[in-house]
Amino acid sequence: MAVPKRRVSKTRAAKRRTHYKIKLVKPVKDKDGTWKLPHHVNPTTGEYK
């Protein structure tokens, strides 16, 4: 079993964790001017984008 040779400092661990974040989904504007999430069907037009 792997055992760390040295203790990882709080700062070093926090720097590594800066990339563990949620990416925000940007809404897309449809042809009819309504905003919707990408990869979802527009209920009014039935368009999938």
UniProtKB/Swiss-Prot annotation:
Organism placement in taxonomy: Bacteria, Pseudomonadati, Campylobacterota, Epsilonproteobacteria, Nautiliales
Any one of the GO CC terms: large ribosomal subunit
Key words of the record: Ribonucleoprotein, Ribosomal protein
Gene: rpmF
Transport among keywords: no
Family: Belongs to the bacterial ribosomal protein bL32 family.
HAMAP family: Ribosomal_bL32
Protein name: Large ribosomal subunit protein bL32
GO biological process, one term: translation
MF annotations from Gene Ontology: structural constituent of ribosome
Species of provenance: Nitratiruptor sp. (strain SB155-2)
Record-annotated membrane-spanning stretches: none
This protein's record includes keyword Ribonucleoprotein: yes
